[in-house]
């Protein structure tokens, strides 16, 4: 952090240029010149934004490879087998184990996802008309969320002038039981059947987050829409890639007015764009163009074509970097990533497992589901590592975020709703010390989610329909 800058820059400053007579803009990450001299707040006194996210995966966990041998902080506890990929970011992890769903009226994937994300509700099913194989119409149930999911509650409270009120991404399309209804494919809900669909290909994410023609429209969301409209469809990939050249003159002019550290940060920002020009096409096996560079302060990646499931790791890591870029540029303060849906039947050829994940969990208790869980956690860990490597003010994006890592059930074989393991990542703007395993047997999941809302600054005293509580968990930081 430089104590003095030649120029103060607005937090909403964008590099600008023109392509064929069309004005273009490129967001900047948080620079020292936007902050006070300590890098702890914006220059006008406004606090650096703290973001909240949910990282969800389907089909639960196997506690034998998920539970540390000891609780405590620092070196008193060690990462269990399936969380080993978090070693580089263990200092930002708060692992909470032993939590229960006490008011367990029902057991199952749909009920679990309602509970851990929206506090549960006794009326999950809506009737929908279907057609059977004989062409006869009948009514069947479809599960949905009857309460807003916690990310949307937090988004309502935190949103000010960020371009996106919340942003939803995902990885694996849902292939499970159709009775899962809207909760099978969609994490974020604002009410019954009012969901915000996750974006699952890098091209769509680019279009909505990093418009080359104009900044995204404020707000975002809507029933099934999933966010603000993207750039016009007739803007070609070639044109988008040339945006970097269009704004280069403005970037060089700005660098002349800034200190050395901010100049380096802008260089890294531009290098990051070049790096993703390679990353996204290569994820499809098509090759790329341009140079390489750090993603440390990248803010505006190029467009990408869809990535196939066979390239799942490349796709996942690309989406992670796009999401971190959005956070570093303060495009949103609330995000969710739905790796897979509850009761997901996805296969994992990337780790030589071609059977369905859900079927493995109800099989002979072999290693297959444990290996899938380990792979999924490696991708969650990748997101945290990119956040730690991305500066924000005097710290990093990981310092200024809080992620609720959760699945809908605990042990999946019997749909157990006891001994949930929640993987929290980030320091929540300095409110969570991290590097801690907190064992709280018999405590309610709703207590944890209420605590997360209060950490994010919400004035809420109780939460939940099932297991409604006003009790919180100071054990996370004391």
Say what each PLM segment does:
Residues 1-478:
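Ligand-binding pockets and gating/stacking loops
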